[in-house]
């Protein structure tokens, strides 16, 4: 049984919402680097899309551990934190980006990128899920 499939259904509901969360990766000295991000629940994993040159890519290449937190804006006391590891893959078709922006009401994500932008998918596989 996966961590996500055994998670509280309320946590899964938050992760399915069109919210902004905070992805935290680790600098080389172990200090946190946090970024507000859109995301997509994809089966048991959480997907993010990013572009070349971002600090989070350098951090993940060195240490794939990460945490992701999102709260329900209609109830500030309702949140979920997902801890796990991230695998980075090339996303030249920007499929992940488009799926994420569609969740937020945009037809596609082409307006978010300049021509020639190099896109990557970050796949967070949970090892622990907590929340309220």
Task: Give residue ranges: language-model regions.
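Short, surface-exposed beta-strand-loop junctions and turns on beta-sheet-rich folds
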Residues: 54-56, 75
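A short beta-turn/loop motif at secondary-structure boundaries
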Residues: 29-31, 72-76, 114-116
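Charged, gly/pro-rich active-site loop segments
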Residues: 2-6, 78-132
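Generic structural signal for secondary-structure transition and capping sites
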Residues: 19-20, 65, 105, 129
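Charge-dense, helix-prone N-terminal extensions
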Residues: 12-13, 43, 104, 132
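Extreme N-terminal tail/first-helix region
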Residues: 1-20
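Short beta-strand segments
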Residues: 18-51, 66-70, 80-81
